[in-house]
Structure formats: C-alpha cells, structure tokens
Amino acid sequence: MIRAVLLGLRAVVFDREAARRLYASGYYGKPLGIPKPRGSNFDAPLELGLLETLHLLERGMLEVYDEEGHRVSVEEVRRRAERFIPKFELLYKVYRDLRDRGYVVRSGLKYGSDFAVYERGPGLEHAPYLVHVMRVDEEIDPLEIVRAGRLSHSVRKAFILALTGPRDTPIRYLLLKWSKP
C-alpha cells in the first residue's frame, strides 16, 4: 500500500519508488520540483491535491497519515476538502466521474477552468478538454460562456460545462464548440 502524509491541503508520497508507481498508474499528483515530468522516470516525492488524495483513498490505493503518524480516515480528508475547497461536493463528483471513465484529470486553473482533462495523460498529449463545473440550477451570464469559449478556442481545447447538483443529481456534460456561420 502506498503511504502519504497529509500536510495542509496536500498529501505527499515521500517514498520515491511508490511515487513513481502512483504517477505511472494514472498521472496522479506532481513530482516536487519537476514542473513538466516526462513519464514516471523521476526521483522526487509526489504531491497530491485533496481531490486526488480522497479519490485514491476511497479506492484503497493510498493510506494517509498525519504528521504525527496517525492514520487519517476518508471522512477526515473529505471534511478538510469541504472546508477549504469552494464547491467541493460538485468538483469531486465530476472529478470522480471523469476518472472512472478513464480520463486523466488535472487542475485547469491556468486556463480559468476547474479541470484540464486528458485522454492519455500529460506529457503524452495536450489536454483536449477544459471543464467548468456548475450547479445545474445555477444561472450563467452568456458573456461568461463566450469568454470561456474564446479562451478554450485560443488554446485549442474543447470547452465542457459539467452541470450537476447534490448527491443523486446526474451529471450532464455540455460540449461547446465555435461554429462559423
């Protein structure tokens, strides 16, 4: 079992061999000090965000401990994520769904979206999709759609709205594309 230590809003896998295995198993996390890793041949600890940590913990791929060496439960990680990540429930629901469908999900912050989504993985391709997560009943300003569409078009990525709600609300994915009249 791979062991991680929860440090604030991140979990770190210090065992470098375990870090390489975990990264190779689905491009989870970021090797510390390596901005753009090419594959899993790196020699560094692996930093995981709370969404990744919770996902791996729920799937039995990771054990999480605090700094004193006490085991951290799924519920504790979830509570921490709910406290510090705005719209956590919606984001995690979409993150988990995309991962379960076989996609590699990374932060889309540098593109102004919630997620950048890969079919194969970073370093193998550019992310073909940007995903913005919203509540299904949330209003959106049409100008925001135009902005997001223009940005995604300028970086050659498809823009997807992921619309969902609390627990049992299904996720609806809307792919927005530019069309020429």
Curated annotation (Swiss-Prot):
CDD domains: tRNA-intron_lyase_C (cd22363). Keywords: Lyase, tRNA processing. The active site is at Y118, H126, K157. GO terms for biological process: tRNA-type intron splice site recognition and cleavage. Pfam families: tRNA_int_endo, tRNA_int_endo_N. InterPro entries: tRNA_endonuc-like_dom_sf, tRNA_intron_Endo_cat-like_sf, tRNA_intron_Endonuc_cat-like, tRNA_intron_Endonuc_N, tRNA_intron_Endonuc_N_sf, tRNA_splic, tRNA_splic_arch_short. GO terms for molecular function: lyase activity; nucleic acid binding; tRNA-intron endonuclease activity. It comes from the Archaea. It catalyses: pretRNA = a 3'-half-tRNA molecule with a 5'-OH end + a 5'-half-tRNA molecule with a 2',3'-cyclic phosphate end + an intron with a 2',3'-cyclic phosphate and a 5'-hydroxyl terminus. Its EC number is 4.6.1.16. The keyword Lyase applies. The keyword tRNA processing applies. Homotetramer; although the tetramer contains four active sites, only two participate in the cleavage. Therefore, it should be considered as a dimer of dimers. Endonuclease that removes tRNA introns. Cleaves pre-tRNA at the 5'- and 3'-splice sites to release the intron. The products are an intron and two tRNA half-molecules bearing 2',3' cyclic phosphate and 5'-OH termini. Recognizes a pseudosymmetric substrate in which 2 bulged loops of 3 bases are separated by a stem of 4 bp. NCBIfam families: endA. Belongs to the tRNA-intron endonuclease family. Archaeal short subfamily. This is tRNA-splicing endonuclease. The lineage of its organism: Archaea, Thermoproteota, Thermoprotei, Desulfurococcales, Pyrodictiaceae.
